[in-house]
């Protein structure tokens, strides 16, 4: 099959990559696998970090996808699906506690010891599949994974109408977080560097502020979605005493930061990663969030190298691949 392959040094299109069917056939019966024909896959910031050496991954990247089941349990054949990206072992303490996302032996689609969705087919545990409602287009469904990550915040903290929330970052993740948190009734402000991206967020009814116009003030909750050390420092300066700081993005670069404000101001710091796919699909089906305005361009998989270069440009929105 055709796939976009990362060998640790170079990204290339491989027209004869070993099919994901071999993965389905080779898995133990404990983890029943489905072979999914990929309709669309999204390039995200994590993929771009992988191309810089993050996680030491080699193989087929990609973890945001929508497709249809071509092989697997009969009841799933032909169904349009998305899939949770963490493949737990099913036997450890975390898996037994329904925390497979934190399984120490987990594989992660396109990130850790498992080929991903930048290919014609991807192999996914049946237990990880979610059926896509007919009311949700492929172009919407491909956002399920990052949208679920935004919904994870609402499972971790209690937001009430009138709470003041600041979302730092106007990129794709910041946009989705702002839209989702607005559903809580809290008062959301999005802060970013790009007027055009903030304009997209503003259309959802969220107050926006350009960084150049920022006048420091305090918020009950800060969601850090910039992935930058500067964003983290700003977040620590803007959260009220006994407020909450949600770290939604990974800051890969080494950076010295004083944690004294966390102790002095008794700040609650919460790490936040993957989230509930069912909530994301429900929101997409009910049209409570708008994701298609975030799409910049759709590339053919054969042009995947150019697509990844486009995704890495400053100001780029969501780049999709179509096998």
Label for each model-derived stretch:
Residues 82, 223, 246:
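N-terminal Rossmann-like NAD(P) cofactor-binding module of classical short-chain dehydrogenase/reductase
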Residues 89-168:
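NAD(P)H dinucleotide-binding glycine-rich loop of Rossmann-like/cofactor-binding domains
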Residues 136-212:
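Mid-domain Rossmann-like dinucleotide-binding core that forms the NAD(H)/NADP(H) cofactor-binding site
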Residues 230-288, 323:
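Glycine-rich phosphate-binding loop and adjacent beta-alpha segment
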Residues 278-323:
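C-terminal hydrophobic helical "lid"/dimerization subdomain
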């Amino acid at each position: 099959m055709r796939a976009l392959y990362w060998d640790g040094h170079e990204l290339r299109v491989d027209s004869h990559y070993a099919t994901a069917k071999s993965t389905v056939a080779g898995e133990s019966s404990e983890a029943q696998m489905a072979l999914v024909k990929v309709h669309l896959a999204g390039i995200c910031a994590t993929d771009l970090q992988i191309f810089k050496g993050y996680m030491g991954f080699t193989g087929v990247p990609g973890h945001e996808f929508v497709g249809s089941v071509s092989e697997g349990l009969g009841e799933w054949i032909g169904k349009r699906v998305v899939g949770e990206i963490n493949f737990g072992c099913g036997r450890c303490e975390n898996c037994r506690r329904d925390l497979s996302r934190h399984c120490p032996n987990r594989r992660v689609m396109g990130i850790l010891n498992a080929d991903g969705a930048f290919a014609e087919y991807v192999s996914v545990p049946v237990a990880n599949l979610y059926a896509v409602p007919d009311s949700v287009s492929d172009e919407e469904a491909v956002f399920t994974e990052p949208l679920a990550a935004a919904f994870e915040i609402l499972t971790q903290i209690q937001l009430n109408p009138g709470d003041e929330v600041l979302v730092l970052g106007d990129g794709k993740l910041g946009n989705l977080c702002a839209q989702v948190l607005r559903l809580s009734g809290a008062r959301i402000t999005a802060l970013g560097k790009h007027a055009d991206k903030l304009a997209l967020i503003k259309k959802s009814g969220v107050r926006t502020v350009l960084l150049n116009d920022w006048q420091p003030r305090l918020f009950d909750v800060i969601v850090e979605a910039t992935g930058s050390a500067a964003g983290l420092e700003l977040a620590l300066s803007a959260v009220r005493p006994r407020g909450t700081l949600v770290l939604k993005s990974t800051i890969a670069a080494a950076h010295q930061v004083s944690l004294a404000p966390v102790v002095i101001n008794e700040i609650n710091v919460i790490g936040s990663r993957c989230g509930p796919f069912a909530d994301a699909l429900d929101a997409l089906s009910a049209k409570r969030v708008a994701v298609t305005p975030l799409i910049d361009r759709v590339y053919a998989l054969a042009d995947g190298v150019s697509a990844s270069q486009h995704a890495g440009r400053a100001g780029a929105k969501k780049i999709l691949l179509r096998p």
